[in-house]
């Protein structure tokens, strides 16, 4: 029995790739024991619980960096306790390898891994490296990345492998719609609006505005996020409660409007759904904009700047993507192929990391 630990917390952008990798590897390697490690935020508990996973929860709820006063002191204490808990966990389970998926929860695992001499891999989903990724690179760990760029690291300091995506099955259109419980299936184009795991009232508001324009006659907009609730605020616009089973929504989407989180963009790419990406302007070091530029560069969609772009540009680009979906008709694309491909590459990197030890996991 081989043991692999996947460390991911914070938001769905870190957690979903870990779940995607773990599920793919577990289905292919029955003798592989996969454990998950998370922080203690309610959102993290919700995401893992929905996937039927019981992770090891570290006693921390966020990074002490960027905070001050009592909150910063409290979080530093949580970090120290988490390092101790992670060190104890590594000592008890003796994993063959550990993969860090970034976010605040990865720092205690990185420190504990150095203490217990656990082989560590780091995956960076975004086109801008996070603090743990940069620290790992300075320690001689070559980050595995989701994109062809990982600022400020230069070529040769990282290796692009893609972002693991959750294995999901494409459903027939009517079956997918019925799972949402929204009544009769509408005719015309369906646009999926994704604000990330934290939701986005700004995107919901923008869609509500443009949905009334004559250019979008016959379109239906499915707006997912906690702000909308389960409602039908106007003709052609449905609010979908936050959900983690995305298969029905991806199966319905002809086009999407989305924030620039790497996990979301990778899943849209795997499903061949053209997307208008609206990067969240407050993202760390503007990493969502960097993700969006590379998403556009690979021909998967277009970018609209929320602060500087006009409504006319938003409308024109969304219409352009709607025409792209008509021309390419990618409804037969199997998203499971992309999930399997990235996981196989990842497995190869894990095995390479174990060279020199008992690294033959395939016996």
Language-model regions: role of each:
Residues 3-9, 31-81, 161-163, 305-307:
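Conserved nucleotide-sugar phosphate-binding/catalytic loop shared by glycosyltransferases and other
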Residues 26, 84-98, 106-121, 134-138:
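Glycosyltransferases and closely related glycan-assembly transferases
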Residues 35, 54, 114-174, 182:
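Active-site-proximal region of nucleotide-activated glycan assembly enzymes
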Residues 95-97, 251-266, 273-274:
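Acidic donor-binding loop of glycosyltransferase active sites
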Residues 258, 274-285:
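Short hydrophobic beta-strand element within catalytic cores of glycosyltransferases
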Residues 298-299, 303-305, 309-326:
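C-terminal "capping" alpha-helix adjacent to the active site of nucleotide-linked donor transferases
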Residues 317-323, 336-363:
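C-terminal alpha-helical cap of glycosyltransferases
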């Amino acid at each position: 029995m081989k043991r692999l630990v996947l460390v991911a917390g914070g938001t769905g952008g870190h957690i979903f790739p870990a779940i995607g990798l773990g599920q793919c590897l577990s289905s292919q390697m029955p003798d592989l024991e996969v454990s998950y490690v998370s922080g203690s935020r309610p959102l993290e508990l919700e995401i893992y619980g929905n996937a039927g996973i019981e992770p090891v929860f570290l006693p921390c709820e966020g990074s002490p960096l960027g905070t001050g006063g009592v909150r910063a002191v409290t979080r530093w204490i949580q970090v120290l306790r988490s390092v101790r808990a992670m060190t104890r966990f590594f000592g008890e389970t003796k994993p063959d390898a550990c993969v860090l998926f970034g976010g605040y929860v990865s720092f205690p695992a990185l420190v504990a891994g150095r203490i217990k001499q656990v082989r560590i891999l780091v995956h960076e989903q975004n086109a801008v490296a996070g603090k743990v990724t940069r620290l790992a690179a300075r320690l001689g760990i070559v980050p595995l990345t989701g994109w062809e760029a990982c600022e400020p690291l230069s070529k040769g300091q990282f290796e692009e492998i893609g972002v693991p995506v959750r294995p999901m099955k494409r459903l027939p259109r009517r079956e997918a719609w019925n799972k949402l419980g929204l009544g009769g299936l509408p005719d015309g184009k369906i646009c999926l609006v994704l604000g990330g795991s934290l939701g986005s009232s700004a995107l919901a508001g923008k869609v509500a505005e443009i949905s009334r324009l004559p250019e979008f006659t016959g379109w239906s907009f499915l707006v997912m996020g906690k702000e909308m609730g389960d409602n039908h605020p106007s003709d052609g616009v449905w609010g979908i409660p936050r959900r983690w089973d995305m298969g029905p929504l991806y199966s319905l989407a002809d086009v999407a409007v989305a924030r620039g989180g790497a996990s979301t963009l990778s899943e849209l790419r795997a499903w061949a759904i053209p997307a208008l990406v609206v990067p969240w302007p407050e993202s760390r070091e503007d990493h969502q904009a960097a993700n969006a530029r590379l998403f556009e560069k690979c021909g998967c969609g277009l970018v609209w700047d929320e602060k500087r772009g006009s409504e006319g540009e938003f409308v024109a680009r969304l219409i352009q993507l709607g025409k792209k979906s008509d021309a390419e008709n990618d409804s037969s694309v199997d998203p499971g192929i992309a999930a399997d491909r990235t996981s196989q590459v990842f497995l190869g990197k894990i095995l390479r990391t174990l060279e020199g030890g008992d690294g033959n996991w395939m016996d």
